[in-house]
UniProtKB/Swiss-Prot annotation:
This is DEAD-box ATP-dependent RNA helicase 21. It catalyses: ATP + H2O = ADP + phosphate + H(+). SUPFAM superfamilies: P-loop containing nucleoside triphosphate hydrolases. Keywords: ATP-binding, Coiled coil, Cytoplasm, Helicase, Hydrolase, mRNA processing, mRNA splicing, Nucleotide-binding, Nucleus, RNA-binding. Residues 39-60, 70-147, 722-733 have a biased composition (Basic and acidic residues).
Length: 733
């Protein structure tokens, strides 16, 4: 049954009232719902019209209610358009939000990337900053320490002065009392310099003055013979002048007396010492004690020991055999060096020798020639005695030095036919042992490899009575003291020299002879000398540990980061000359060589990490001038002779001054000049004192930073860093 809209509305209102009581739902059809919605719409339009009329607004055009379907379509279209427009607005807003979010994310990523880059730069700068801060802190601490020490020293001086004044009494200044004679002395109107009076006697106008001849071997610098001759000449001139002034002719008796006086002045007595000729113009028989003293002073030779023979002045006076003299001439040695002058005569007398000489002074020939002369007196090697081992052993700290000594020994033994064998690491020990068992007169070895051969029975030393320790201090520093002692203990001890220093040695008898050469004398070397050497003669050429005067030393203070740039600058100035760059570590050696190679330099390396074959190739290439820059560790710093090295650069300063001496000794050899440049930083304070002393002794320039540094004032270990005692009073401003 269908109902009208009014009935529906009425029933709805009634049902609404009843729903509050019965709460019974009313179900409407679709048409009823549409009519209800249209009714509500008309009610809303009526309400809006009433509201506009109340507000005085014009009434909009009303819609025809009768056109229900048309209005509904329009409403649907309008709602759809409105929804579509709203969707577009929302989509547009969402697009703007997405763009804004994307831009915000992009900005955030940029900021994060900038933060990461800034953190990366900070991390890169952090080591340099820490180093600068550390250096700054060290400088501040050093200045503060120096200031405190100065204050403490000043207070100690004040305290000492107060104690002296309390117990000894202070010196009171005395008031000068003017004597009456001085108080009332007559004052002239002129000065003493205006006095024109002269001594009337001519003898007193030109008084005779004795000339002191210091440095010519005279006592107090006075040569009595020269003084008498000058006095006689002065007297003759004065007499001639007086006779000429008075017009007196010299009588024959006076002339004869004058000749007698001149002859007496020229006559030698027991106190006179002849100065007529230099020692180089005299024969060996004419040399006096004074001549030998001048000779030793000229070559800076000093001895310590008893019954010391005279040094040799030339190869002709050396008492070497003709074969050795021919080999010396063939090697191009025209004049002996000071260490050769002093050590060869000692070796020919079978004396134990400790030689201390500067680097590059010819120490190799100083012990090789006496060794060859000693072997020449022994029976030749045969099948019967080949198994007893060599006649002589030479020990060196490094392979390169051992091979260099082998080359020199072969050169000097050219006319004698002696066999020389080197035993070093990096090669087959079986092959080296076979060479020894096949027979050789001389073995040149490193201590470690030689003791291995002895322990494995590849070699024996049953007839070895001549041993040389070259660069003994270096072997001790490298920890070879037990190996050296083991080799010396393996030698026969039946023919040791007598312990009595005054007892003469029998020249026909074979004694055990030990040569020890070193640039310095550390305690380890002294221990070996006391145990194994009998009455040794210590020969010192120059000052122990001193560098040759042919080396020009330069020290440059800088930061660690400035080293490579300064190295390139020095190498650019080098031209075609050769240079050795010393560093402390193998890693740094390879790194610097790689960077120099990239920069276009002809560079090679040499350090302990290379095989023996690689080391020989590098060294041979540098000697042959295929490379002009050698970057090396201290393996090259001792004993190795590389000719014509113009410049030595200490890229890293060594920890001990002895190693510095040997490093720069690679230049300035064989009478040629050289340059040594050292890069110094504030991390090298342990060598500041010794380096400053060496620069001062060699008349080299001392950088102001080194001269003023606290570490250069005191030798390390002599001023302990102790806290102030309770009795100390320290004032700090």
């Amino acid at each position: 049954m269908k109902r009208t809209i009014n009935e529906v509305v009425g029933s709805t209102s009634v049902n609404t009232l009843d729903s509050s009581i019965a709460k019974k739902p009313v179900f409407l059809t679709k048409k009823q719902r549409e009519e209800l919605a249209l009714k509500r719409r008309q009610d809303q339009i009526s309400e809006q019209r009433v509201r506009r009329e109340q507000l005085g607004r014009p009434e909009p055009e009303t819609e025809d209610v009768s056109n229900g379907d048309t209005n509904r379509d329009k409403d649907r279209d309008r709602d759809r358009d409105r929804d579509r427009e709203r969707d577009r607005d929302r989509e547009r807003d969402r697009g703007r939000d997405r763009d804004r979010d994307r831009d915000r994310d992009r900005d955030r990523d940029r900021e994060r990337e900038r933060d990461r880059e800034r953190d990366r730069r900070e991390r890169d700068r952090e080591p340099d900053r820490r180093n600068r801060e550390k250096e700054r802190e060290e400088e501040v601490k050093a200045r503060e320490k120096a200031r405190v020490e100065k204050l403490v020293e000043r207070e100690k001086e004040k305290e000492l002065d107060a104690i002296k004044e309390q117990y000894l009494g202070g010196k009171k200044p005395k008031k000068r009392v003017i004597r009456p004679s001085e108080k009332f002395r007559f004052s002239f109107d002129w000065e003493n310099t205006e006095d024109t009076s002269r001594d009337m006697n001519v003898l007193y106008q030109n008084p005779h003055e004795a000339q002191l001849l210091f440095g010519r071997g005279f006592r107090a610098g006075m040569d009595r013979r020269e003084q008498k001759k000058q006095a006689a000449k002065h007297e003759k001139e004065m007499r001639d002048e007086i006779r000429k002034k008075d017009g007196i002719v010299e009588k024959p008796e006076e002339a004869a007396a004058q000749r007698v006086r001149e002859e007496a002045a020229d006559t030698y007595d027991s106190f006179d010492m002849r100065v007529d000729r230099h020692w180089s113009d005299k024969r060996l028989e004419e040399m006096t004690e004074r001549d030998w003293r001048i000779f030793r002073e000229d070559f800076n030779i000093s001895y310590k020991g008893s019954r010391i023979p005279r040094p040799m002045r030339s190869w002709e006076e050396s008492k070497l055999t003709s074969e050795l003299l021919k080999a010396v001439e063939r090697a191009g040695y025209k004049k002996p060096s000071p260490i050769q002058m002093a050590a060869i005569p000692l070796g020919l007398q079978q004396r134990d020798v400790i030689g201390i000489a500067e680097t590059g002074s010819g120490k190799t020939a100083a012990f090789v020639l006496p060794m060859l002369a000693y072997i020449s007196r022994l029976p030749p090697m045969s099948e019967e005695n080949e198994t007893e081992g060599p006649y002589a052993v030479v020990m060196a700290p490094t392979r390169e030095l051992a091979q260099q000594i082998e080359e020199e020994t072969v050169k000097f033994a050219h006319y004698l036919g002696f066999r020389v064998t080197s035993i070093v690491g990096g090669q087959s020990i079986e092959e080296q042992g076979l060479k020894i068992t096949q027979g050789c007169e001389i073995v040149i070895a490193t201590p470690g490899r030689l003791i291995d051969c002895l322990e494995r029975r590849y070699a024996v030393l049953n007839q070895c009575n001549y041993v040389v320790l070259d660069e003994a201090d270096r072997m001790i520093d490298m920890g070879f003291e037990p190996q050296v002692a083991g080799v010396l203990d393996a030698m026969p001890s039946s023919n040791l020299k007598p312990e009595n220093e005054e007892e003469e040695l029998d020249e026909k008898k074979i004694y055990r002879t030990t040569y020890m050469f070193s640039a310095t004398m550390p305690p380890g070397v002294e221990r070996l000398a006391r145990k194994y050497l009998r009455n040794p003669v210590v020969v010192t050429i120059g000052t122990a540990g001193k560098t040759t005067d042919l080396i020009s030393q330069h020290v440059i203070m800088m930061k660690e980061s400035e080293k490579f740039f300064r190295l390139q600058k020095l190498l650019d100035e080098l031209g075609e000359k050769t240079a050795i760059v010393f560093v402390n570590t193998k890693k740094n050696c390879d790194s610097i060589a790689k960077n120099l190679d990239k920069a276009g330099y002809r560079v090679t390396t040499l350090h302990g990490g290379k095989s023996q074959e690689q080391r020989e190739i590098s060294l041979e290439g540098f000697r042959a001038k295929r490379y002009n820059v050698l970057v090396a560790t201290d393996v090259v710093g001792r004993g190795i002779d590389i000719p014509d090295v113009a410049h030595v650069i200490n890229y890293d300063m060594p920890k001990h001054i002895e190693m510095y001496t040997h490093r720069i000794g690679r230049t300035g050899r064989a009478g040629k000049s050289g340059v040594a440049t050292s890069f110094l930083t504030l991390h090298d304070t342990e060598v500041f004192y010794d380096l400053k002393q060496m620069l001062v002794q060699s008349n080299s320039a001392v950088p102001p930073e080194l001269a003023r540094h606290e570490a250069s004032r005191f030798k390390p270990g002599t001023v302990p860093d102790r806290p102030p005692r309770h009795s100390d009073t320290v004032y700090i401003n």
